[in-house]
Amino acid sequence: MTKQAEETQKPIIFAPETYQYDKFTLNEKQLTDDPIDLFTKWFNEAKEDPRETLPEAITFSSAELPSGRVSSRILLFKELDHRGFTIYSNWGTSRKAHDIATNPNAAIVFFWKDLQRQVRVEGITEHVNRETSERYFKTRPRGSKIGAWASRQSDVIKNREELDELTQKNTERFKDAEDIPCPDYWGGLRIVPLEIEFWQGRPSRLHDRFVYRRKTENDPWKVVRLAP
């Protein structure tokens, strides 16, 4: 069968357009001078919505150079300040660590289904200082701290038993430790935004979209409306 013929075959999965976005609108009067302020408002509204069970979930996308291959994964956003959005992870062995080491550009997306809203952020990444990483690490459950030591994230392992054995070894290693230290390869990464888009779903896919842009962190924000 030719490639063209394959493309005309019935798809394995077909998702017809049935869902309508019809709850809210977004217009110029609702915008703020600083997009961080509008994001904070939207995020707090998502937190207060009982149907948004994990408002801090994000899609984090990075790209390795020189290949340009993009990788994405779901992570949990942890901190926000006026410089940017911070996540925490293994920066020694993970796929995203390799990507960021070759290309500091990254993007994150928040999607709140019940509120029919999406926020897309593009920017430059930077590692937070050690003090900040250790401060956050102390708030993690003990099991998660041990897990950070046990797992060389994204390395190939033989089976689940290997991971369980490493976890047990580190559980024994730190059994007398009141405070488990933060590994030197583990810490925070801040995405300093250069572009933040606010998307509000509207009927017939005629969504409201506004994007804030700046060339560098020190430049003022400019905002424009985009066609849906």
Curated annotation (Swiss-Prot):
The annotated subunit structure for this chain is: Homodimer.
Give the PANTHER family listed for this entry. Answer: PYRIDOXINE-5'-PHOSPHATE OXIDASE, PYRIDOXINE-5-PHOSPHATE OXIDASE
Q: What class of enzyme is it?
A: oxidoreductase
User: Gene3D superfamilies from the entry?
Assistant: Electron Transport, Fmn-binding Protein, Chain A
Its UniProt entry gives the catalysed reaction(s) as:
pyridoxamine 5'-phosphate + O2 + H2O = pyridoxal 5'-phosphate + H2O2 + NH4(+); pyridoxine 5'-phosphate + O2 = pyridoxal 5'-phosphate + H2O2
Q: Which family does it belong to?
A: Belongs to the pyridoxamine 5'-phosphate oxidase family.
Q: Name one Pfam family in it.
A: PNPOx_N
Q: Which cysteines are joined by disulfide bonds?
A: none
Pathway(s) per entry: Cofactor metabolism; pyridoxal 5'-phosphate salvage; pyridoxal 5'-phosphate from pyridoxamine 5'-phosphate: step 1/1; Cofactor metabolism; pyridoxal 5'-phosphate salvage; pyridoxal 5'-phosphate from pyridoxine 5'-phosphate: step 1/1
The record's NCBIfam families line, in alphabetical order, gives: pdxH, PRK05679.1
Cofactor(s) for this protein?
Answer: FMN
**Entry binding sites for FMN:** 73-76, 88-89, 95-96, 118, 153-154, 199, 209
Keyword Ribonucleoprotein among record annotations: no
- This chain belongs to the protein called Pyridoxamine 5'-phosphate oxidase
- Which UniProt keyword terms apply here? Flavoprotein, FMN, Isopeptide bond, Mitochondrion, Oxidoreductase, Pyridoxine biosynthesis, Ubl conjugation
The entry's function note states: Catalyzes the oxidation of either pyridoxine 5'-phosphate (PNP) or pyridoxamine 5'-phosphate (PMP) into pyridoxal 5'-phosphate (PLP).
Tagged with keyword Metal-binding: no
What does the record say about how the cofactor binds?
A: Binds 1 FMN per subunit.
**BP GO annotations:** pyridoxal 5'-phosphate salvage; pyridoxine biosynthetic process
* Localization, UniProt: Mitochondrion intermembrane space
Chain positions of cross-link Glycyl lysine isopeptide (Lys-Gly) (interchain with G-Cter in ubiquitin): 29
Q: Which InterPro entries match?
A: Pyridox_Oxase, Pyridox_Oxase_CS, Pyridox_Oxase_N, Pyridoxamine_oxidase_dimer_C, Split_barrel_FMN-bd
| GO MF assignments | FMN binding; pyridoxamine phosphate oxidase activity
